[in-house]
Amino acid sequence: MILSNGEPIKCTHSEPLAIYISGGITGVKNWKDIFMAAEQDLILHLHARFFIFNPVKIAKDLERSFKVNIGRMPSYTDYMREDIKILAMCNAICMLPGWKRSKGARLEYRIAKILNMQILEWQPN
């Protein structure tokens, strides 16, 4: 279930809620499955106008672009720059379990706080 300060999420924005999913990737064996499960849970439980930005899909698009235009895979820095650019367009972030162990997720959390985004926490059922 998705939580925000212990309460179910409510869309309080007049505009659609854009949610960026954040969590550990480096060193997490099944990170793609975790991110996809969180996205599916958001889709199933939130009955409002939402856009969900999932780093699994962002990474695929970035890798495709790099292969075609640059001829190499993106670096960690390249992934983070793309993720931060997309995060900055959102008005909410959904933190996955274990995010505090991830340098990138901690940075994304700090950016979300600075940009006054709604911060959500996701726990699998």
Where are the language model's segments positioned?
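Conserved catalytic or regulatory cores that recognize and/or transform ribose-phosphate-containing ligands
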Residues: 1-125
